[in-house]
Design a protein with these regions (language model features):
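NAD(P)H-binding glycine-rich loop region in Rossmannoid oxidoreductase-like domains
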Residues: 39-111, 122-125
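SDR active-site strand-loop-helix element
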Residues: 11, 35, 78, 116-122, ...
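Conserved glycine-rich Rossmann-like NAD(P)H-binding loop of the short-chain dehydrogenase/reductase
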Residues: 30-37
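Substrate-positioning beta->alpha
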Residues: 100, 135, 164-165, 184-205, ...
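Conserved catalytic-site region of short-chain dehydrogenase/reductase
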Residues: 84, 122-133, 158-163
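N-terminal Rossmann NAD(P)H-binding glycine-rich loop of SDR-like oxidoreductase domains
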Residues: 2-30
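Mid/C-terminal beta-alpha module of Rossmann-like enzyme folds, strongest
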Residues: 2-5, 203-267, 278-325
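Conserved beta-loop-beta element that borders a ligand/cofactor-binding pocket
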Residues: 120, 141-162, 168-171, 175, ...
């Protein structure tokens, strides 16, 4: 029987997923080392059983990675280069993602890591994927090309307080009684609650049968983005009207959304561009490997709203930037 890794390297601990995963791993007794960029500071918002080790490195600089990998059994790869303050800053993210993934894999191989668990995105390669989704899949291929057993989880829209997708949904529906949206809002997706994502990430670490696999993760509902907005409106008791127009390009949509939400245009643009791709699970093996009580879209929204009401102090540090009014 394969032993469960105990010493875990966590990348992206200041992010929406990473901050929650840090707490979950700590509660289950794993020893966690957080990889933090040289320009960042890890702020822990929730009480932990043991203080995580913090190691500073830059994935674009291979020479900074060996000390971070030393003594680790497994690693979570939760980083991506999307997220510049402007669309121009974001356009070069695919090349940065490739460099980061190659450097990380090389360092992991040299350090003798047994496993990597990567959270990427859904979408079929034949569907003319957006640059964002194509980059996430390319990163998975790079990580799975090496000697370290890499599990790639592919998710669609992740619903959680502070996350870009949920905050876009929240601000648009709260602020706009009438919405003019591109026709892509009719594209189907399979949203998943952030709580379920964390359960799958931890479950992969405990379940050796997931090693080396690519697994789709999604919630129980397959719905359009229009339906997501209407579900949010119903939960909040709001009356909203949505009209589609054929002329809104992703770039124009991103600039418009940036005016009414606090989410930077550099994050909005790749998310909006990806609306044209249907992102639903084609493979449900993970439901047998890691049984999880999946939350509905309505339940995920209710949980996210409850967490939002608690304020940024209850959330990982980077999320606070999406919660300003």
């Amino acid at each position: 029987m394969t032993a469960v890794p105990k010493n875990i390297l966590l990348t992206g601990p200041t992010g929406v997923i990473g901050g929650r995963l840090l707490y979950a791993l700590d509660q289950e007794g794993f020893r966690v080392r957080c990889l933090v960029r040289l320009s960042e500071r890890l702020e822990i918002k929730r009480p932990l059983k043991q203080q995580p080790e913090v190691a500073y490195a830059d994935l674009l600089q291979l020479e900074t990675l060996p000390p971070v990998m030393e003594g680790m059994d497994a690693a979570y790869y939760l980083v991506h280069s999307m997220g510049g303050r402007s669309i121009k800053e974001t356009k070069a993210f695919a090349e940065r993602d490739r460099r980061c993934a190659r450097n990380f894999l090389k360092a992991a191989e040299e350090a003798g890591l047994k496993r990597i668990i990567y959270l990427g995105g859904l979408g079929e390669t034949g569907d003319k994927l957006s640059k964002h989704l194509a980059s996430r899949q390319e990163v998975a291929k790079i990580l799975q090309s090496g000697r370290v057993e890499t599990t790639a989880l592919r998710a669609a829209v992740i619903i959680g307080a502070g996350g870009a997708s949920f905050e876009l949904l929240r601000y648009m529906v709260e602020r706009l009684p009438v919405m003019m949206c591109p026709r892509w809002v009719n594209t189907r997706s399979q949203p998943i609650a952030v709580e379920n994502v964390i359960s799958y990430l931890v479950g992969c670490l405990r379940e050796p049968a997931t090693s080396g696999l690519t697994l789709d993760i999604g919630g129980p509902d397959i719905i359009s983005y229009r339906e997501m907005m209407m579900i949010y409106a119903r939960v909040r008791g709001l009356h909203r009207f949505i009209f589609t127009v054929p002329v809104l390009t992703p770039q124009l949509s991103a600039y418009w959304i940036n005016l009414i939400t606090p989410v930077p245009a550099g994050i909005v643009f790749p998310l909006v561009e990806g609306l044209k791709n249907e992102v639903i699970c084609r493979d449900n093996r993970i439901r047998d490997l890691i049984p999880v009580d999946l939350m509905s879209m309505e339940g995920a929204i209710c949980n996210s709203l409850t967490e939002t009401e608690k304020g940024p102090g209850q959330l990982p540090s980077r999320q606070a930037c999406f919660l300003r009014e």
